[in-house]
Curated annotation (Swiss-Prot):
Its cofactor is Mn(2+); Mg(2+). Pfam families: RNase_HII. One of its GO terms (cellular component) is ribonuclease H2 complex. This is Ribonuclease HII. Manganese or magnesium. Binds 1 divalent metal ion per monomer in the absence of substrate. May bind a second metal ion after substrate binding. Belongs to the RNase HII family. GO terms for molecular function: manganese ion binding; RNA binding; RNA-DNA hybrid ribonuclease activity. Keywords: Cytoplasm, Endonuclease, Hydrolase, Manganese, Metal-binding, Nuclease. A divalent metal cation binds at residues 22-23, 120. The gene is rnhB. Endonuclease that specifically degrades the RNA of RNA-DNA hybrids. GO terms for biological process: DNA replication, removal of RNA primer; mismatch repair.
Length: 203
């Protein structure tokens, strides 16, 4: 279970607003990559927070509401399939994370600037001090919270995308390359929201 050990060491070094960041959708064939950043109050732990992939849909939704209530700030950044194809998924992921950090706002809509950033296994191009945490969503409470926010928000987008592009089962597969999704691609061809650079081995 993730702890606040990493955050505590940074708080004890004199930093206050630690933004924790994670992404979802990096490996998808369809749709944007989405990153979320979360600033939690010092020493606050939300029971049950862990890597979003290890939680049920219902539990993620419940925890998302608690994270929204207890966090100091949340930011979200997305990068479209078109941009992913132009700059590659690694750069697109970093860009989404940068957007999330720069869009951090409190409940009143005020911009909140972090003084330290913890990121799941990445580094981003901002002047703020930062650390990349390998397996961050397993180890770091704040990164796990960010993973939940990112997963919930992207899953909600997938439901909307399903309505706009009904042939691919996006509401169920979330854009990942399941067997049914690959077969639908062969039958219908790619939609404008598919990542063309990901489809070379499929089509």
């Amino acid at each position: 279970m993730p702890t606040i050990d990493i955050e505590s060491a940074i708080w004890n070094s004199g930093y206050e607003n630690i933004a924790c960041c994670d992404e979802v959708g990096r490996g998808c064939l369809f749709g944007s990559v989405l990153a979320a950043a979360v600033i939690m109050p010092k020493d606050v732990i939300i029971d049950g927070v862990k890597d979003s992939k290890k939680l049920s849909h219902k539990k993620r939704e419940q925890l998302y509401e608690i994270i929204k209530e207890k966090s100091l700030a949340i930011g979200v950044g997305t990068v479209s399939s078109e941009i992913i194809d132009k700059i590659n998924i690694k750069n697109a992921t970093r860009l989404a994370m940068k957007k999330a950090i720069l869009s951090l706002k409190d409940k009143d809509g005020n911009i909140v600037a972090p003084d330290y950033i913890l990121i799941d296994a990445e580094e981003i191009d901002v002047p703020t001090p930062q650390s990349a945490v390998i397996k961050g969503d397993d180890l770091c409470h704040g990164i796990a919270a960010a993973s939940i926010v990112a997963k919930v928000l992207r899953d909600r987008l997938c439901q909307r995308w399903e309505e706009e592009h009904p042939n691919y089962g996006i509401g169920q597969n979330k854009g990942y390359g399941t067997k049914a999704h690959r077969e639908a691609l062969k039958e219908h061809g790619p939609s404008p929201m598919h990542r063309k650079s990901f489809l070379n081995k499929i089509l």
